[in-house]
Regions:
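Short, glycine/serine-rich, charged loops/turns that create anion-binding
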Residues: 65, 108-111, 143, 207, ...
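Core AdoMet radical
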Residues: 73-89, 96-189, 199, 203, ...
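Glycine/Thr-rich phosphate-binding loops of Rossmann-like dinucleotide-binding domains
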Residues: 68, 112, 171, 238, ...
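Nucleotide phosphate-binding site architecture
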Residues: 45, 66, 169
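A secondary-structure boundary/capping signal
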Residues: 40, 60-61, 105, 139, ...
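Auxiliary Fe-S-binding modules of radical SAM enzymes
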Residues: 1-57, 92, 98, 122-134, ...
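Canonical Radical SAM [4Fe-4S] cluster-binding loop centered on the CxxxCxxC motif
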Residues: 4-13, 49-86
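Generic alpha-helix structural propensity
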Residues: 21, 25, 39, 60, ...
């Protein structure tokens, strides 16, 4: 399943090159505040487009992950100690970028007793205090399925809860070695049961079958997920899983139509789509987030 990267990418996978004043400003902001972004660490193909729009997805809890998923470019190993000043710097960066919608994610920190939940909560509250009109979307690890740690994060009241199942049930083990399909569905269902809008996503092109994709989407709907992202898997290095096939834009459009037909409220589906791609647009129709942007407040969850 591992191979070199000689296969030629199709034309529809050409991403925008980094450029412009906004791109430079975001890069300086990230560097000056000693922040990490999943855009850089995960080699996101949309970094040029998003940074040129003045947006970035901040990654907390360092940039070294305790897990070694076979699809992910983020560095793995022994993480550094927690940075107690990180929540305040993240909040200030959100203010500087004047974001109406921010996305925060993290590496997985399985060595921490609470999986980093306390830092997650502190970051959400710092952003809220500094930026009361900003919608906060969190993209978290599975917290080892510990719902008390997940509740620590949810008690800080993010506006959208995101956790990706990444692939279909059959391919979980080769793709996400230390995670499980059922555990991911459990954390999504728990967040949804507390009233949070929930979101998840899959990569296509890893060898999944059509019936497996439709089953995974139905499982997400059964777990209460309302926002969906579907994108093409891209092999980050020769040491990672090889691409099984290039999924066409037309097929992504078909999956979007199917997902909408089974009840997803918003679907972002395309070759270059990633979890936080156009996240502000994904949340635009969600009542609570819309009220927040218009100067109101979200109901307690």
């Amino acid at each position: 399943m591992f191979a070199d990267m000689k296969s030629r990418k199709p034309s529809w996978l050409r991403a925008k090159l980094p450029s412009g004043v906004e791109y430079g400003a975001v890069r300086k902001l990230v560097d000056d505040n000693k922040l990490h972004t999943v855009c850089q660490s995960a080699q996101c193909p949309n970094m040029g487009e998003c940074w040129s729009r003045g947006t970035a997805t901040v990654m907390i809890l360092g940039n070294i992950c305790t897990r070694s998923c076979n699809f992910c470019a983020i560095q793995t190993g022994r993480p550094t100690e927690l940075d107690i000043g990180e929540p305040a710097r993240v909040a200030e960066a959100v203010a500087t970028m004047r974001l109406k919608h921010c996305v925060i994610t993290s590496v997985t920190r399985d060595e921490l007793q609470d999986g980093g939940a306390t830092v997650w909560a502190a970051t959400i509250r710092a952003i809220r205090n500094r930026n009361p009109g900003t919608a906060i979307e969190v993209l978290t690890p599975d917290m080892r399925g510990r719902l008390d740690d997940l509740d620590t994060i949810l008690d800080a009241k993010p506006d959208i809860y995101n956790h990706n199942i990444e692939t279909v049930e059959r391919l979980q083990k080769p793709v996400r070695v230390q995670a499980t399909y059922d555990r991911s569905l459990k954390v999504l269902a728990h967040a949804g049961s507390r009233g949070f809008p929930t979101k998840s996503g899959l990569m296509l092109g890893l060898g999944e079958k059509k019936e497996e994709i439709s089953a995974a989407l139905q499982d997400l709907r059964n777990a209460g997920v309302t926002i969906l992202t579907l994108g093409q898997y891209l092999q980050p290095t020769p040491k990672h899983l090889a691409v099984d096939r290039w999924v066409t834009p037309e097929e992504f459009a078909d999956w979007k139509a199917f997902a909408q037909s089974i009840g997803f409220e918003f679907v972002e589906s395309g070759p270059l789509v990633r979890s936080s791609y156009h996240a502000d647009e994904q949340s635009a129709g969600i009542t609570g987030v819309q009220e927040l942007r218009e100067g109101g407040s979200l109901a307690s969850a």
